[in-house]
Structure formats: structure tokens, C-alpha cells
């Protein structure tokens, strides 16, 4: 692991890593321009140091999803107010270095303020170029008392994203307002990075992990756990049918009042993406708290969603995801969202228009303009009819030609971005079953039920051969199918954009020797078990 303290060293290191990644690919992979660059995915975990279990969870996620993981450690003077704790904020670089090494981090970027051209002043006094988020997002919640804080956050995060140019950057849900601001920043500035939100990690008492927790005495830590208990009370009220902000906030306030040393700064209910105040939850809301305990300021939040559960089914090609998902949706009365069919439809259109598979720009143009519709069908074999640009392609997308090229098309960032937006729009109200390769990790990371279906290559090849025979497709040998499936597994697992991965909270089902009905029944049983716990 490298410790880098200058911009020059960081750029040199990143250039070297990208080049090394290309050189370590096999000759066959290098010749395939579509896959030779996948292994260079870079993940950035921005921190202010004083690392704790929450940071380690971000590092673990980044390590799982990228070939290179960079952790930045920079105590940003721009986000501290004149009377805040910049001077006494914990500085534990050697301890942080050890934790990063244990977590498999490739490099730490720990520059001084001078190296980044940041004066050790607050944002109001600084002459540095600033990034100003929308005022409506930074005037409420923490922004009300921490003037200039989010301008300072946005400025330094933009600088780090520009310096590292990561494929993914990881932030915790605990700082819900910060997360929303950064997502908006990336969207508005069209920055080519995926912002990955990770769940809040808590101590045994329920207290959200924070670098500032070390300011607390043992007794204060126990008292501070009342914030989480307040959120739990609100969650219980929400599940019981309470939807109005005033009532939910009062539930939290009553719980916090039990600890007199906790001084509430705010209890607010806002829309999680826009941060606009909510009077009533229609779809989802973020219930956020800020409070002081002694000289320590604490924040916490929870997301309350008024929707039916989502079942996310992931797994490699030929694992039976589509058939299983259709059966599960039918048994539970949920909508089946055939995401794979959407990628197949785009692939069919690319082939139909004679566009080269490696012509990323032409494919990006096509994917961003095409119109895909999924409609229910009475056909048990094809319960979803697929339309692209008003053409019914339900049968066309299942051909060998489309099957052999869909992974390469689906791996292209522009294609996935265009289709994921549509999928997430459909999933807003829940009540659906979706299958693919990154549903639980990328499309619906907050799905209530996550399943990872898998089977041996030989089993999947036999299933695929049987499918082709039923469809009247030309005969393909098992040996060739096994080779194709193994190659597809590699492409799907190593692509830079949303690779095939098992979500950390997914249940894995090995389906060799099991019938479709057996697998569907297991998922339905698990769904009902989970439902009884909500």
C-alpha cells in the first residue's frame, strides 16, 4: 500500500495502475477492446481520517467492486465554521494507515491543505474557487446552523473527483444531506462517476459510527443511543400507518426527551433526493435528527418508504433467473420487470441497424434515444411483451445472435445508465420482481429481498441447449455453450460498469438438480418470512 501526499504522486500512481491493469490482461483480452479496460475500475473512499467501522464498511464495498481502491484522508478546513472543531478534529494518520492496509486499500491520498491550494480558513473567508450546491438543499437541516459547510464539502469533493477520476465513490447514508448534495452535484455537472450510498454502520447500542464519537465519554455514548431509539420508534409508527410529518417528528421528540442531556437541534422529514420538507410521506422520506450532547454534535437519519417490497434476483447467465422471477411474481401477485429483455432489445436494435458492437458512441446515441416498453402478456412462455421504438421484438431478442452480443452491449456505461433510469422509475413504488446481474447491487440496492441464483457451468449449458431446442434454434454443442457461458461469466464479473456480483445481504441459492418450481418456492418462502419481520 502506498501513502501519497502530493498531487503529482497521485497522478503518477493512477497512471501506472491503469497501465499495469492493461498489461496484466491476457493477449486475448487485450485484443478485445470491449473488455481489456474493465479491470482498471477505480474506487474512491473520501474521508477526513480518524477511521472507524463505518469507513471500513465503505472500504470493504469498494474493495469488492474495484481493482484499485484509493482512500483520501483530508481534514477539509472549508467545511468547518469559525467556532467548530477543525483544530481539535482527530488526526490519527498512522492508525488510519494500518486500518487501510488491513482493509486491502491500494493507496492513501493524504495531502496537506497547502498541497490542494486550500487555505486553512472557513469557506466565507477563503478566496478559493467554490462549488455552490442549490440553496434549497443547503439552507435546511444541518445547513441552517453550519453556514458554508456544504459549499466546503462540495468544493473539496469536486476537487477529489477531478484528481482521482474514479469510476465509483463511496459515501455513508448517515450523512444523508451530504449524500444528497453530492449526488446532485455529480448529476448537475455531468461528472462520470457513480456515487455509491452505503448503509449506516452502528455500535452495539445503535449509535451511528462517527469520528466525533470519540469526544463522548462512556456514559455519553449510552445516552447518545437515544437518537437511534427515536428513529426506531418513528419506524414502528410508520409501519403502523402514520404518514404525517408532525406525528412522526413528535414520536422522535418524545423519545429524545427521556434523556435530558440531549439538546435537539432539529428533527425534520424531507424528501431524500431533493431535501424538500415533507408534510406527508407519499413514496419515501428521510427522517433526520441533529442534536448536541455536551460539546459534541451528533446526526442520524432513517429512510421511510411507503411501497410494496422489491425482490431482486441476480446471478450468472443460464442460472434460470428469468423463469424463476416470472414464477415468483405470479405466485406473489407482483409485477415482473424483465431488465434482461431491455438490454436484449437494445442489442437487437444495434444489430438491426448494422452498428459495430465496439462503436460505443453510436450505441450510446441509440440507447439514449430509444423507447422501450414492457407490457403483460397471456403467453406463459413470454409473459412480458417487449417493444423497442414501437416494434415488437419479444421473440427476436432470444436468438443466438442477440444472446452472444448482449453482454458486450450491457457492459457499456451509456447503455446501462439509460436503462437503469427507466428501471428505477418503474421501481419507485415497489411491488415488483426484477432479475439481472446487478439488480441488488446497483439498480435496487435497497430491495427488501435479494437473491443470488447460481448453478454450475455444465448445468447452465444443458439448460440453454434445451431452451434453444424448444425455440427451434440451430443446434449448438454443449462444449460450445459451456465455453460461451464461461466467457460470459468472465465478462459480466469483470466489466467496469456494474459488474455481476452477489450483494452482501443477498441469499445465495445453488440450483443444480432443482426444478424451477423448487427454486421459486424457496424464494416465496423466504419472501414471506422476511415480510413477517417488517
Swiss-Prot record:
Pathway note: Cofactor biosynthesis; (R)-pantothenate biosynthesis; (R)-pantothenate from (R)-pantoate and beta-alanine: step 1/1
CDD domains: CMPK, NK, PanC
One annotated Gene Ontology cellular component of this protein: cytosol
A Pfam family that the UniProt record links to this protein: Cytidylate_kin
Record has Transferase as a keyword: yes
Catalytic activity as recorded in UniProt: (R)-pantoate + beta-alanine + ATP = (R)-pantothenate + AMP + diphosphate + H(+); CMP + ATP = CDP + ADP; dCMP + ATP = dCDP + ADP
Ranges for region Cytidylate kinase: 303-534
Compartment annotation: Cytoplasm
Domain of life the protein comes from: Bacteria
Record EC number: 6.3.2.1, 2.7.4.25
Stated role: Catalyzes the condensation of pantoate with beta-alanine in an ATP-dependent reaction via a pantoyl-adenylate intermediate. Catalyzes the transfer of a phosphate group from ATP to either CMP or dCMP to form CDP or dCDP and ADP, respectively.
Protein name from the UniProt record: Bifunctional pantoate ligase/cytidylate kinase
Organism: Nostoc sp. (strain PCC 7120 / SAG 25.82 / UTEX 2576)
Amino acid at each position: 500500500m502506498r501513502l501519497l501526499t502530493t498531487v503529482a504522486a497521485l497522478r503518477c500512481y493512477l497512471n501506472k495502475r491503469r497501465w499495469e491493469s492493461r498489461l496484466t490482461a491476457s493477449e486475448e483480452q487485450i485484443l478485445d477492446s470491449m473488455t481489456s479496460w474493465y479491470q482498471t475500475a477505480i474506487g474512491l473512499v473520501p474521508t477526513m481520517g480518524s477511521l472507524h467501522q463505518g469507513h471500513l464498511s465503505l472500504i470493504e464495498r469498494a474493495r469488492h467492486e474495484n481493482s484499485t481502491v484509493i482512500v483520501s484522508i483530508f481534514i477539509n478546513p472549508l467545511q468547518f465554521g469559525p467556532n467548530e472543531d477543525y483544530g481539535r478534529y482527530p488526526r490519527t494518520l498512522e492508525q488510519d494507515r494500518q486500518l487501510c492496509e488491513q482493509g486491502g486499500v491500494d493507496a492513501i491520498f493524504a495531502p496537506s491543505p497547502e498541497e490542494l491550494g486550500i487555505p486553512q480558513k472557513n469557506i466565507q473567508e477563503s478566496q478559493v474557487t467554490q462549488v455552490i450546491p442549490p440553496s434549497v438543499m443547503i439552507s435546511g437541516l444541518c445547513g441552517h446552523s453550519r453556514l458554508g459547510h456544504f459549499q466546503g464539502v462540495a468544493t473539496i469533493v469536486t476537487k477529489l473527483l477531478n484528481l482521482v477520476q474514479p469510476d465509483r465513490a463511496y459515501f455513508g447514508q448517515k450523512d444523508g444531506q451530504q449524500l444528497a448534495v453530492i449526488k446532485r452535484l455529480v448529476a448537475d455537472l455531468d461528472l462520470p462517476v457513480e456515487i455509491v450510498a452505503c448503509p449506516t454502520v452502528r455500535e452495539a447500542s445503535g449509535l451511528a459510527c462517527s469520528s466525533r464519537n470519540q469526544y463522548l465519554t462512556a456514559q455519553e455514548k449510552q445516552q447518545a443511543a437515544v437518537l437511534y431509539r427515536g428513529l426506531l420508534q418513528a419506524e414502528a409508527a410508520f409501519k403502523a400507518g402514520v404518514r404525517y410529518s408532525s406525528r412522526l417528528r413528535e414520536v422522535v421528540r418524545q423519545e429524545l426527551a427521556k434523556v435530558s442531556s440531549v439538546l435537539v437541534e432539529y428533527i425534520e422529514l424531507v424528501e431524500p433526493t431533493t431535501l424538500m420538507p415533507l408534510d406527508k410521506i407519499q413514496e419515501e422520506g428521510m427522517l433526520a435528527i441533529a442534536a448536541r450532547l455536551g460539546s459534541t454534535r451528533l446526526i442520524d437519519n432513517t429512510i421511510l418508504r411507503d411501497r410494496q417490497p422489491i425482490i431482486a434476483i441476480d446471478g450468472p447467465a443460464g442460472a434460470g433467473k428469468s423463469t424463476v422471477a416470472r414464477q415468483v411474481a405470479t405466485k406473489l401477485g407482483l409485477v415482473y420487470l424483465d431488465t434482461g429483455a431491455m438490454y436484449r432489445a437494445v442489442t437487437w436494435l444495434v444489430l438491426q441497424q448494422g452498428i459495430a458492437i465496439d462503436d460505443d458512441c453510436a450505441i450510446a446515441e441509440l440507447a439514449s434515444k430509444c423507447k422501450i416498453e414492457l407490457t403483460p402478456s397471456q403467453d406463459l412462455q413470454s409473459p412480458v411483451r417487449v417493444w423497442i421504438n414501437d416494434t415488437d421484438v419479444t421473440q427476436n431478442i432470444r436468438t443466438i445472435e442477440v444472446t452472444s452480443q448482449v453482454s458486450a452491449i450491457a457492459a457499456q456505461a451509456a447503455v446501462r445508465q439509460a436503462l437503469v433510469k427507466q428501471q428505477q422509475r418503474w421501481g419507485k413504488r415497489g411491488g415488483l420482481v426484477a432479475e439481472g446481474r446487478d439488480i441488488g447491487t446497483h439498480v435496487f440496492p435497497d430491495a427488501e429481498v435479494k437473491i443470488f441464483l447460481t448453478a454450475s457451468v455444465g448445468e447452465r449449458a444443458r439448460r440453454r441447449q434445451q431452451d434453444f431446442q424448444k425455440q427451434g434454434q440451430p443446434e449448438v454443442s454443449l462444449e460450445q455453450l459451456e465455453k460461451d457461458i464461461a466467457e460470459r461469466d468472465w465478462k459480466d464479473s469483470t466489466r467496469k460498469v456494474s459488474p455481476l456480483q452477489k450483494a452482501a445481504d443477498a441469499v445465495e441459492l445453488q440450483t443444480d438438480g432443482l426444478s424451477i418450481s423448487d427454486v421459486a418456492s424457496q424464494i416465496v418462502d423466504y419472501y414471506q418470512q422476511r415480510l413477517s419481520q417488517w
